Regions:
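N-terminal membrane-anchoring/stem segments of glycan-assembly enzymes
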Residues: 1-122, 172, 379-383, 499-532
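Short, acidic, metal-binding catalytic loop of nucleotide-sugar glycosyltransferases
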Residues: 144-154
Length: 532
């Protein structure tokens, strides 16, 4: 159990206007919660340099080697049904790297600063929307403390409480925030935001999830873009996450997992106007959403659909990789699984909608969104299919199991285990590999549910409030992973023993034994739901 007292004191702003009622939280109870603070001046610029060439060159190289080995396996063994998975993976490789990431441009900090200088006059009114739905009281209080420190004279803060919690209402009153509820919780978070859209009036509004703490200069860095270009509808910044030694391994790894998307992929997509809106840590121009009655009305990933809608309507979505707010990741596997499920479902739902293909987005913008959907599909199918080539080779073609066949997979191992930690601007622990297993299985169940029409709706991120349906998906994912892992382990080691006993050279089976053992080690925390 972690003591949060020191964190509360160390992260409290010196100008905290609510210091008089900060004290009672210290003695309420010692909970397993990390309270974030805004990004430091150093953290603010961590994502400005994307390290594009390292990721692009080695990512493309490792993926090409893997795809080459996969296609050679299909041709050599006649396993042509496997070509469906190989084809999807190859298309993803082409679209993601050759059409988006390798040809994207880096963020230009000098241009950004010029925009600040030339468009810094005036302070248009901004509504700050704080949707809450049963999150931890300490987390909410911590975030609101930093919201009050936003340096913008014409801001008005609204708390959007979908739980109608008297404690939250009282806290909002003490902070001087406006408090909004509604009669029902229709469409969950999306409905909450749409309801607030009808009850607020400022020409711009910002959204902060319950755990995201903004820097005081948040609006000063973003608002000049709207006066610089009157066609910009949304300015999106990264979801930057706290990564500290006193967090659970899930929190630390989850924060590191997101860096690639916000530091590299989003920047590449912004080159073509195809960046994704992620809801929180963004500022919106109200005028652009009036035709839709506010943000998108959908039960999951309303942010992605909102961004798509405004771009389709002729507006622009701008992404700037400045870390201007910091939050915390889910601290347990079940919550992380549910979060990733929603994100995969949102992207898949958008790109499988016929309107997406008929939309006004350019070819390159559609490629940006398509690469996201294909990523979820490839990672989902890989959970079960990645081990199949090795198993088929053992079962049917043991004479062709040669040690150097593993060289097709070697660049991918180097890329994930060595180059990614070197590239990362934050800590990149080995446990990231454990978390990617949970991530992949969440994608698998999201796609399965999309195909079968059994999707889960949105729920607030957090371990205590997980819904039964989410818990069931999580348990099913762990069981499936356990079965696949156990079968692969027993079959690989059993068949290897059999073949070596009958005169085959052990050296040719060593790479397979090593990779199977490594796969078992990597999958185990997800299977066992290990939290420490």
């Amino acid at each position: 159990m972690r003591n949060i007292t020191s964190m509360l004191f160390s992260h409290k702003p010196s100008s905290d206007p609510e210091a008089s009622f900060y004290e009672p939280l210290l003695s309420e109870h010692d909970r397993n919660i990390i309270l974030p603070s805004p990004p430091t001046s150093h953290e603010k610029y961590l994502y400005v340099k994307s390290g594009r060439w390292l990721i692009s060159i080695f990512g493309l190289l490792s993926s090409t080697c893997l795809m080459t080995g996969m296609w050679l396996f299909i041709v050599a063994t006649g396993t042509y049904w496997f070509s469906v998975f190989a084809a999807v993976s190859t298309v993803y490789l082409y679209v993601s790297y050759l059409m988006v990431n390798c040809v994207g441009k880096d963020f230009n900090l000098r241009v950004h600063r010029n925009i600040q200088k030339l468009n810094s006059r005036g302070c248009p009114a901004v509504d700050i929307l704080l949707p809450v739905c049963g999150e931890d009281f300490e987390v909410i209080h911590n975030t609101w403390t930093y919201v009050t420190a936003l340096d913008w004279p014409t801001k008005t803060v609204y708390v959007l409480d979908d739980k109608k919690d008297p404690k939250i209402r009282d806290l909002a009153q003490r902070f001087g925030f406006n408090y909004i509820t509604r009669e029902n919780n229709h469409m969950k978070k999306a409905g909450n935001l749409r309801n607030a859209f009808t009850k607020t009036t400022a020409p711009f509004f910002a959204i902060f999830d319950a755990d995201f703490c903004p820097r005081s200069d948040y609006l000063k860095e973003i608002m000049p873009y709207f006066s610089h270009d009157d066609k910009i509808a949304i300015v999106q910044t990264p979801q930057f996450f706290e990564v500290r030694p006193d967090q659970t391994w899930v929190e630390r790894a989850a924060g590191s997992v997101q860096e690639l998307f916000y530091r590299f992929i989003q920047v590449s997509r912004d080159t073509f106007g195809g960046a994704v809106c992620v809801g929180t840590c963004a500022v919106y121009r109200r005028e652009s959403l009036v035709p839709f009655g506010g943000t998108a009305e959908i039960g999951f990933s309303e942010d992605v659909h909102t961004g798509f809608a405004v771009v389709d309507d002729g507006w622009k979505l701008k992404y700037i990789p400045l870390n201007l707010a910091k939050g915390v990741c889910p601290y347990e596997l079940k919550s992380f699984f549910s979060q990733q499920y929603r994100w995969a479902l949102g992207s898949t739902t958008l790109c499988t909608n016929p309107h997406f293909w008929k939309s006004n987005l350019s070819f390159r913008q559609k490629a940006c969104f398509l690469s996201g959907m294909l990523y979820f599909q490839v990672t989902a199918f890989a959970t079960v299919l990645a081990t199949i080539p090795g198993l088929i080779m053992l079962a049917r073609f043991p004479e062709h199991v040669l040690w150097f066949n593993a060289t097709f997979a070697l660049p991918s191992l180097i890329f994930g285990w060595i180059l990614m930690p070197v590239w990362s601007a934050q800590d990149y622990p080995f446990t990231v590999n454990h978390l990617k297993v949970a991530q992949s299985y969440s994608h698998l169940f999201a796609i399965k549910d999309k195909l079968m029409g059994t999707m889960m709706l949105w729920e607030s991120t957090g371990g205590a409030g997980a819904a039964t349906s989410s818990a069931n998906r999580f348990l099913q994912g762990r069981i499936l992973c356990g079965l696949v892992t156990a079968f692969s382990l027993v079959f690989t080691y059993g068949m290897t023993y059999y073949y070596v006993h009958h005169g085959y050279a052990l050296v040719n089976f060593l790479p397979g034994l090593f990779l199977t053992a490594l796969n078992t080690l990597t999958n185990s925390p997800f299977i066992m739901n290990r939290q420490d």
